[in-house]
A protein has these predicted regions:
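Positively charged n-region of N-terminal signal peptides that target proteins for export
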Residues: 1-4, 8
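C-terminal motif of bacterial Sec signal peptides marking the signal peptidase cleavage site
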Residues: 15-19
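Bacterial signal peptide processing site
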Residues: 21-24
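Long, contiguous binding/interaction regions
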Residues: 33, 42, 97, 105, ...
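Surface-exposed, low-hydrophobicity interaction/linker segments
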Residues: 47, 51-103, 122-140
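A short, solvent-exposed beta-edge/loop patch
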Residues: 104, 116, 141-186
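A short acidic-to-branched-hydrophobic micro-motif
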Residues: 109-119
Length: 190
């Protein structure tokens, strides 16, 4: 009887461990050279690369049309975009669309915006303007550690800032999905 129970327990354990070892095989890496369809698609692909237990409380999009628990499109005509995503007002003409994902409890913990550039706008120049805006911001209610700015296919610029506990996994997931994106800025926030 003991041998039978031991065999059943061993079999149950093997089956349980096998089931727990399964991982989603869904492809989340963007094909090399392919330009994403939208700013929102970029953030959705990165967020999809997170395991459920890694995700944190986020809100996406503009405050007039928020998306709970996921990235969302940000209306670039919404006057709050300069406050929420720190894009300088003089840079608004350089973007045609935006998407965002912000930590629900404190934007300084994690904020990310992806901006589609208007035709002829340099990703490096836009990135420099965003770097100056974020580095020059007067912070309240917490202080972000890191600023990350990436150029995606010369058509999009991702700007993310936050505490290292949020930024390190975000950069890992972003790089897994968009390995060909060029890093324009990756620096501590002064």
């Amino acid at each position: 009887m003991k041998k039978f129970l031991s065999a059943i327990l061993a079999l149950t354990m093997v089956l349980s461990l096998t089931a727990c070892g399964g991982k989603s095989t869904e492809e989340t890496t963007a094909p090399a050279g392919e330009v994403p369809a939208s700013a929102l698609e970029i953030l959705e692909n990165v967020w999809a690369d997170y395991a459920e237990e890694e995700k944190f409380a986020v809100i996406g999009g503009s405050m007039t049309a928020p998306v709970d628990g996921a990235p969302g499109s940000y209306d670039i005509t919404d006057e709050n975009i300069t406050y929420n995503l720190l894009i300088p007002a003089d840079q608004l003409a350089n973007v045609t669309e935006a998407a965002s994902m912000i930590h629900m409890m404190n934007a300084n913990t994690f904020t990310c915006g992806v901006f589609r550039l208007a035709e002829g706008v340099s990703a490096a120049d836009f990135g420099s303007a965003m770097q100056a805006a974020v580095q020059g911001n007067m912070w309240m209610c917490g202080f972000p550690d890191t600023l990350l700015i990436k150029d995606i296919a010369g058509e999009y610029v991702l700007v993310a800032f936050g505490v290292n506990e949020a930024m390190t996994p975000f950069e890992t997931h972003f790089s897994a999905v968009y390995p060909n994106a060029e890093t324009l800025v990756n620096e501590p926030i002064a």
